[in-house]
């Protein structure tokens, strides 16, 4: 059960007709799930104060178009953004990279991490890592597949 306001806001926006329409019209396949950090062993490692930590984003999306799949992690944040910088910095290791499974060299996988909420108080360096609340549909419309060079 989802009880955190920022997650509830995200799910409400996801359920809007225009957001669903954007997903259905722009991807051959899409699915999403809430990540449960107590059940799922799905995390992004990062360092904070020289200690290794585990970041469990709240939601994961699988978006496929043709031979490319985007694995998109979205982590809604409330009005007080805390500790996102270290998590965003850890994601930079994957940002812009395209992965190819050994058993299917024509298939491409791209990993995306975004935070969701009001990005007015977010530092300039991290603004591109955020989806502005009430702009989720636009994010899915503008999310581009990286072509392998």
Model region roles, listed by residue range:
Residues 1-149:
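Electrostatic, structured charged patches in enzyme active sites and in nucleic-acid/phosphate-binding
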């Amino acid at each position: 059960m989802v009880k955190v306001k920022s997650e509830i806001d995200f799910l409400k926006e996801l359920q809007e007709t225009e957001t669903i329409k954007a997903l259905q019209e722009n991807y051959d396949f899409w699915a999403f799930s809430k990540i449960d950090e107590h059940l799922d062993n799905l995390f992004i490692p990062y360092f904070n104060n020289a200690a290794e930590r585990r970041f469990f984003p709240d939601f994961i999306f699988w978006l496929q178009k043709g031979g490319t799949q985007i694995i998109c992690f979205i982590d809604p944040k409330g009005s007080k953004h805390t500790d996102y910088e270290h998590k965003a910095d850890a994601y930079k290791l994957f940002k812009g990279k395209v992965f190819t499974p050994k058993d299917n060299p024509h298939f491409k996988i791209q990993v995306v991490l975004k935070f969701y909420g009001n990005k007015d108080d977010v530092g300039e360096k991290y603004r591109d890592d955020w989806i502005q609340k009430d702009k989720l549909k636009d994010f899915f419309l503008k999310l581009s597949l990286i072509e392998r060079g």
